[in-house]
């Protein structure tokens, strides 16, 4: 049987797409999930201290608000449980093909169908929604000798809780978002922790990360509109912050001054303080939030190593100054394949086009959601739809305001739909024109940029503008073949 829609992934994006498709009267669709459980990022990232840095009321689906959050900024287990609850409430589990890893997605022009090859067999679909997300594939560091390490190795996104860290010498590579949350949790139990830092991060204190009071939960449950009001107040606060990222970069100096005061208060050692001081504009790389990272870094069993890594040997990490730092456990907090996401390499469209090329700056896209050489294929979390200041869930729902009507039209008219190349080029050029005047155009090296230095990741404007631009399916912007 040919599916109307094949959805790749069952995290926030896949679940939201399923609910929106069903609400639009579209049936005969399925989610393909390579794991044995739903949840995506929040299923996979189980490292100690893992939490969201967007408020719980905002980092949730608009049609599935949760009045029972226990913390204003939730930890991983509660977010994963929220996704499980969403699937249960909307009866989505039966739509998920668990343990189905997609190996290839190729368009059959003669049949006007997408052919999906999985480890459990082959499928066909009239439409495809890629909802695997940008944080799906863990990136191990490209360091000589990593495979020769005699101890135990793991990535924060593939945490192995069976590894006992008590009394161990631990090497942590990376000081990004995962590391900043995880390091304070392992320092008290490790005998020694070496933290390898390439670039210092801007870190702000977590001003509002606190347990939700009982009376607040009762208000959310029984006072109509109360939680909705809090959600939107948080949204607009973040949009004001976004102005500094996108239009008023000089205002970031206030945040940089505040971050410096926080760092100076926590780190009294001038040498360590200097090592932890960023040399780029705040926001060019992801801004981190933590009350516990700096206190962890001043503990007597912690060393911050900024000397470059030469190679990894059986007994530890050798830096470029020739010193061998012995370790029992190697933890890689080295992020994900974002601008070169492997899922893009699996998708083959017209004229032998490969979707991954869009992230290399070689292919235009439309609304970060569709591509001219990939008919009836759509992508959540596509080019320039990630954020540096607000909730990605808002962006997913905005994209679906375009994607679902487009799919509904294609099914109703039995049509093949793809954005006109001229419209895709127009959209992509507009994004590129915006970026140089934003904080992401100030010259730092980050995972927001592709190999060519182009911002292919972050939306360089206010999110409410994106919501307006994605409102509905504009037939005049598309090539339509019946």
Residue ranges and their predicted role:
Residues 3, 118-127, 166, 320-329:
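Core beta-strand elements of the Rossmann-like FAD/NAD(P) dinucleotide-binding domain
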Residues 3-7, 12-93, 197-198, 265-269:
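Beta1-alpha1 glycine-rich phosphate/pyrophosphate-binding loop at the start
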Residues 6, 10-12, 16-37, 130-260, ...:
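Rossmann-like dinucleotide-binding core of oxidoreductases
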Residues 66-85, 246-254, 280-292:
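Short beta-strand to alpha-helix junction loop
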Residues 71-136, 311:
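Feature captures the FAD/FMN-dependent oxidoreductase FAD-binding
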Residues 260-326:
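Alpha/beta-hydrolase fold catalytic core
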Residues 333-407:
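Glycine/threonine-rich phosphate-binding loop and adjacent beta-strand/alpha-helix elements that clamp
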Residues 394-397, 401-482:
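C-terminal active-site-capping segments
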């Amino acid at each position: 049987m040919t599916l109307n829609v094949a959805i790749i992934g069952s995290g926030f994006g896949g679940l939201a797409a399923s609910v929106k498709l069903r609400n639009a009267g579209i049936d005969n669709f399925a989610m393909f999930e390579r794991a044995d459980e739903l949840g995506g990022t929040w299923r996979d990232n189980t490292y100690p201290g893992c939490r969201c840095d967007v408020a719980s009321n905002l980092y949730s689906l608009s049609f599935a608000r949760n009045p029972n959050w226990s913390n204003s900024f939730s930890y991983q287990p509660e977010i994963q449980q929220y996704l499980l609850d969403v699937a249960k409430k909307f009866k989505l589990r039966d739509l998920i093909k668990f343990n189905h890893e997609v190996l290839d997605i190729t368009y059959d022009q003669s049949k006007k169908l997408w052919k999906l090859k999985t480890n459990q067999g082959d499928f066909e679909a009239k439409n495809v929604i890629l909802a695997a997300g940008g944080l799906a594939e863990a990136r191990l560091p490209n360091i000589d000798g990593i495979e020769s390490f005699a101890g135990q190795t793991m990535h924060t996104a593939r945490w192995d809780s069976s590894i006992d860290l008590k009394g161990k010498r631990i090497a942590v590579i990376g000081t990004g978002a995962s590391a900043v949350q995880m390091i304070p949790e392992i320092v008290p139990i490790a005998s020694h922790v070496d933290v390898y830092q390439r670039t210092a991060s801007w870190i702000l204190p977590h001003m509002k990360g606190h347990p939700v009071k009982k009376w607040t939960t009762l208000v959310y449950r029984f006072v109509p509109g109360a939680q909705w009001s809090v959600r939107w107040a948080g949204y607009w606060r973040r949009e004001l912050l976004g102005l500094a990222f996108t239009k008023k970069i000089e205002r970031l100096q206030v945040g940089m001054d505040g971050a410096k005061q926080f760092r100076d208060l926590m780190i009294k050692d001038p040498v360590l303080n200097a090592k932890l001081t960023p040399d780029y504009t705040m926001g060019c790389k992801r801004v981190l939030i933590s009350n516990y990272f700096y206190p962890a870094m001043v503990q007597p069993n912690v060393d911050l190593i900024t000397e470059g890594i030469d190679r990894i040997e059986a007994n530890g990490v050798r830096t470029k100054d020739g010193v061998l730092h012995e370790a029992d456990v190697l933890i890689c907090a080295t992020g994900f394949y974002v601008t070169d996401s492997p899922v893009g390499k699996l998708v083959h469209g017209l004229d032998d086009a490969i979707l991954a090329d869009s992230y290399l700056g070689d292919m235009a896209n439309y609304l970060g959601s569709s591509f001219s050489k990939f008919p009836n294929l759509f992508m959540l979390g596509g080019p320039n739809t990630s954020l540096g200041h607000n909730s990605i869930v808002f962006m997913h729902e905005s994209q679906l305001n375009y994607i679902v009507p487009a799919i509904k039209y294609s099914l109703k008219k039995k049509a093949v739909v793809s954005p006109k190349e001229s419209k895709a080029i127009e959209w992509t050029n507009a994004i590129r024109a915006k970026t140089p005047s934003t904080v992401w155009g100030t010259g730092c090296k980050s995972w927001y940029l592709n190999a060519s230095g182009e911002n292919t990741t972050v939306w360089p404007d206010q999110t409410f503008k994106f919501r307006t631009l994605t409102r509905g399916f504009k037939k005049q912007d598309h090539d339509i073949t019946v």
